[in-house]
From Swiss-Prot:
Coiled-coil portions: none
InterPro entries in the cross-refs: Ribosomal_uS15, Ribosomal_uS15_bac-type, uS15_NS1_RNA-bd_sf
Swiss-Prot/TrEMBL keywords: Ribonucleoprotein, Ribosomal protein, RNA-binding, rRNA-binding
Protein name stated in the entry: Small ribosomal subunit protein uS15
C-alpha cells in the first residue's frame, strides 16, 4: 500500500532540482501525489476503510498547502509541476 523505497527514489530523481535534493516543494508534492494515487486505488476497493480515508485526507491537505506555497513563491515552477503531474485538468 505504501510507496516502496525504490519507487520513492525514482520519483525523487525525476523531480529533484539538483543532486541530493529530497526536500524541495516539487519533490514533496510528487511523492505525496504518488501516495495519494495509491491510496485512491486502495479506497476504491475498500470503501469502508475509514482509517486510510483519514490518512488520504491528511495527505491531500499537505499537498494542497505545498502547492499553495509553490504558487505564491514561483508561479512558473508551479505551472510546470502541475502539468508534469497531470493535476488541475
Amino acid at each position: 500500500m505504501a510507496l516502496t523505497q525504490e519507487r520513492k527514489n525514482e520519483i525523487i530523481k525525476a523531480y529533484a532540482r539538483h543532486e541530493g535534493d529530497t526536500g524541495s516543494a516539487e519533490v514533496q508534492i510528487a511523492v505525496l501525489t504518488a501516495d495519494i494515487n495509491e491510496l485512491n486505488t486502495h479506497m476504491a476497493a475498500h470503501k469502508h476503510d475509514f482509517h486510510s480515508q483519514r490518512g488520504l485526507m491528511k495527505k491531500i491537505g499537505s499537498r494542497r498547502n505545498l502547492l499553495r506555497y509553490l504558487r505564491n513563491t514561483d508561479i512558473q515552477r508551479y505551472r510546470e509541476l502541475i502539468q508534469r503531474l497531470g493535476l488541475r485538468r
